[in-house]
Structure formats: structure tokens, C-alpha cells
């Protein structure tokens, strides 16, 4: 149904933990890639990073381990979300790294570790915005409202 909704010009907002990690089958992973325009990168996994020396254009490869953090930048804002158990609010203890896939998809929010916290997609057919942590876990209420308004503006403009 979501595929059909997207093909008819839908606007999709998904926030929460486990968006990527719960999608295990080939069909589910194809849905992430084909419709939500993202791929899941497990926290703690090793990736190859390529550094280019601007002076002589030499390329050096190194292994990096990717992580999330409770500090996020995006939509012109910097904010934190609850990521540890506490008495005020439930915590997003398993935020996810979601990477953009294909044309017109991009990192819309970034953890301060440099990994992607949200993927936005805008085509002539439909739009989507997928977060790797729950929107409602953003600590500051006015910031949470600003983030939601920014997402809604992206989805509807």
C-alpha cells in the first residue's frame, strides 16, 4: 500500500528506531532502497573511507567504524534526543544510521559522528523523510516543533 501511495504522489514521514534493522528480507530491503531511498548501516560496522590529498590527488584508504550519537544537526538546527533511560521520557536506545540511495535522496540530518541520521527524498512523483530515531525523543519541545515544521515544509512545498 505504501508503494501505491508513493506512486500516487504521496508524502511519507517515518521516524523511529529499527526502521532499517527490522527490514531483513530481500523484499523488505528492496522496499527501503526502491521506495524510501535509503540503506541501513549497522552501528559499529566497519566501512572503508577514502581520503584524497588535495595537493597531489593521491587516495588513501582506511577502515572506519560507524556510530551514532545523541547530538544531531539538520534543518538548520542542532539538537539532542533522549538516548538513555531516564525518568522524563522514553529513550531511543537504538538509533540507526540510514544512508541515501539513488538520485534525489540526501542526508537531511547528521549525527555529530558524521553519519546520516535522516534521509530525505524528493522527486516529481513523491517525497519521503525517514529518521533513524523517534522524532518525539528530541529533548527540547520548541526544537521538536521546529524540526517537525521543517519536515512538513519539505514534504509539502
What do the predicted segments below correspond to?
Residues 49-127, 132, 136-139:
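Catalytic beta-strand/loop cores that center a nucleophilic Ser/Cys/Thr
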Residues 6, 24, 30-41, 45, ...:
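Extracellular ligand-binding/catalytic regions of CAZymes and related secreted enzymes
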Residues 1-85:
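A glycine-rich, often tryptophan-bearing local segment used as a flexible ligand/cofactor-contacting loop or short
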Amino acid at each position: 500500500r505504501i508503494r501505491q501511495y508513493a506512486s500516487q504522489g504521496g508524502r511519507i514521514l517515518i521516524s523511529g528506531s529499527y526502521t532499517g534493522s527490522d527490514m531483513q528480507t530481500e523484499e523488505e530491503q528492496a522496499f527501503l532502497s526502491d521506495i524510501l531511498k535509503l540503506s541501513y548501516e549497522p552501528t559499529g560496522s566497519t566501512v572503508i573511507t577514502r581520503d584524497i590529498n588535495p595537493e597531489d590527488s593521491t587516495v588513501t584508504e582506511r577502515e572506519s567504524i560507524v556510530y551514532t550519537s545523541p547530538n544531531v544537526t539538520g534543518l538548520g538546527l542542532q539538537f539532542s534526543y533522549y538516548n538513555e533511560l531516564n525518568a522524563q521520557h522514553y529513550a531511543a536506545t537504538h538509533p540507526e544510521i540510514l544512508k541515501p540511495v539513488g538520485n534525489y535522496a540526501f542526508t537531511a540530518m547528521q549525527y555529530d559522528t558524521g553519519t546520516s541520521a535522516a534521509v530525505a527524498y524528493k522527486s516529481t512523483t513523491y517525497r519521503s523523510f525517514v529518521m533513524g530515531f523517534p522524532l518525539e525523543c528530541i529533548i527540547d519541545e520548541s526544537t521538536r516543533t521546529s524540526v517537525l515544521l521543517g519536515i512538513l515544509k519539505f514534504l509539502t512545498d
